[in-house]
């Protein structure tokens, strides 16, 4: 490929320790195998991240994120733009983008997350514009709006503004990418657009990092049957999921398995999440250096999300770790796995409790599901396989990559 790639990110891709950074880091590496990549991202510079990014990218500019949510909401009231877009509006970021465009022969702009579209030049015969929406964010806010009240009204306004923004961005992008066929279809339905090019670029999982290894059992895990949830614990869908599970599902499980414990594993737990630790059988770990020892210790991993967009990395990682997973329909959406063989899908509190107990009480079934889950990930979810279409999406024939 003649020319460079400009990669725009709303959050630093390294370390790849949460859903969006896992995807952006792997895509960044794949793009760097095709052409020189220049990264402009929000985030603070630190030695480890700077070194890792410098190994992959031809140039790196990390712009501190200073705007607050309150400031973004105020700006949104004045501008009519979505608050989630205003949150990432920055003169310093725009200046960094302009500097890269002036200094290097940029042929492709890869915008990771909708908020970054505001920095892609408009009009003229500029670089190819690839918009990686990943999820349909407007519909996430539409889900939040169902809560009602003042926050529900605010989220309903944000959902409407963001959908208008997403529609306008897709109309000018050369291709818009989504993490699953379900997200792509949802966008086409809610946007009403038929002309813009859309495509699917699914997530994979690191099959070397997440595997059926044995790690020392965390002391806090104890010796009783362990049910584990992993995730960023200041993220509303995760907060909602663990709160519902701890209050509605775990008591049903403990009625029949009195010593069962539920571990909520992830950084930045809110006060509401920390308070769950006072409930019988609930462990709240806070940030841990590595989630794999907790996955290794688990008899069952759960993903009881009621609000979810895209593909859940937490489910892929658990399955790659050869763990039996009980997931909601929302959490399992977009994942190519067979219910009853490679994971269990359950929706109501009673159904989730029954599913977890069936695995706790039938070790042979659990072991068979663990093996099937790992085999499914090996067969269908390597990052190399999932990102194979990337070259064509940036306007490069895959035969050119091979050459």
Enumerate the predicted regions with their spans:
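N-terminal subdomain of nucleotide-sugar transferases
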Residues: 1-61, 102-104
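Acceptor-binding helix/loop patch of EC 2.4 sugar-transfer enzymes
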Residues: 10, 67-87, 127-167, 185, ...
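Donor nucleotide-sugar binding/catalytic pocket of nucleotide-sugar-dependent glycosyltransferases
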Residues: 130-131, 138, 155-189, 193-212, ...
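Conserved catalytic-core segment of nucleotide-activated headgroup transferases in glycan assembly
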Residues: 171, 189, 195-297
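Acidic donor-binding loop of glycosyltransferase active sites
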Residues: 174, 281, 287, 296-310, ...
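Short hydrophobic beta-strand element within catalytic cores of glycosyltransferases
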Residues: 314-318, 324-328
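Conserved acidic donor-binding segment of nucleotide-sugar-dependent glycosyltransferases
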Residues: 343-350, 358-363
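A short, well-ordered alpha-helix in the C-terminal region of glycosyltransferases
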Residues: 365-380, 389
């Amino acid at each position: 490929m003649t020319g460079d790639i400009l990669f725009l990110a709303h959050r630093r891709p390294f370390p790849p320790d949460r859903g969006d950074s896992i995807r952006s880091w792997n895509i960044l590496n794949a793009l760097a195998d095709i052409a020189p990549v220049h990264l402009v991202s929000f985030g603070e510079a630190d030695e480890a991240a700077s070194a890792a990014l410098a190994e992959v990218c031809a140039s790196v500019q990390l712009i501190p994120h200073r705007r607050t949510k309150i400031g973004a909401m105020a700006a949104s009231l004045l501008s009519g733009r979505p608050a989630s877009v205003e949150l990432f509006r920055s003169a310093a970021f725009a200046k960094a983008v302009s500097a890269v465009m002036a200094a290097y022969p940029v042929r492709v702009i890869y915008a990771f997350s909708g908020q970054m579209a505001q920095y892609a030049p408009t009009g003229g015969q500029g670089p190819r514009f690839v918009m990686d929406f990943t999820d349909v964010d407007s519909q996430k806010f539409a889900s939040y709006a169902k809560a009602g009240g003042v926050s529900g009204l605010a989220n309903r306004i944000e959902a409407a503004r963001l959908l208008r923004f997403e529609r306008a961005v897709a109309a000018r992008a050369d291709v818009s990418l989504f993490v699953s066929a379900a997200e792509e279809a949802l966008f086409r339905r809610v946007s009403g657009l038929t002309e813009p090019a859309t495509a699917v670029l699914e997530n994979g999982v690191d099959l070397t990092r997440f595997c059926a290894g044995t790690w020392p059992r965390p002391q806090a895990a104890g010796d009783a049957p362990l049910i584990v949830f992993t995730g960023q614990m200041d993220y509303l869908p995760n907060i909602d999921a663990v709160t519902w599970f701890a209050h509605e599902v775990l008591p049903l499980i403990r009625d029949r398995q009195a010593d069962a414990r539920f571990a909520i594993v992830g950084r930045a737990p809110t006060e509401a999440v920390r308070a769950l630790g006072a409930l019988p059988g609930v462990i709240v770990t806070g940030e841990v250096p590595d989630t794999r020892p907790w996955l290794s210790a688990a008899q069952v991993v759960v993903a009881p999300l009621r609000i979810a967009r895209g593909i859940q990395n937490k489910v892929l990682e658990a399955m790659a770790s050869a763990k039996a997973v009980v997931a909601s329909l929302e959490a399992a959406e977009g994942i190519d796995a067979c219910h009853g063989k490679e994971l269990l899908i359950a929706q109501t509190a009673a159904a989730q409790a029954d599913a977890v107990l069936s695995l706790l009480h039938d070790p042979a079934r659990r072991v068979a599901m663990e093996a099937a889950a790992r085999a499914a990930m090996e067969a269908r979810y390597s990052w190399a396989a999932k990102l194979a279409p990337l070259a064509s999406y940036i306007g490069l024939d895959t035969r050119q990559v091979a050459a």
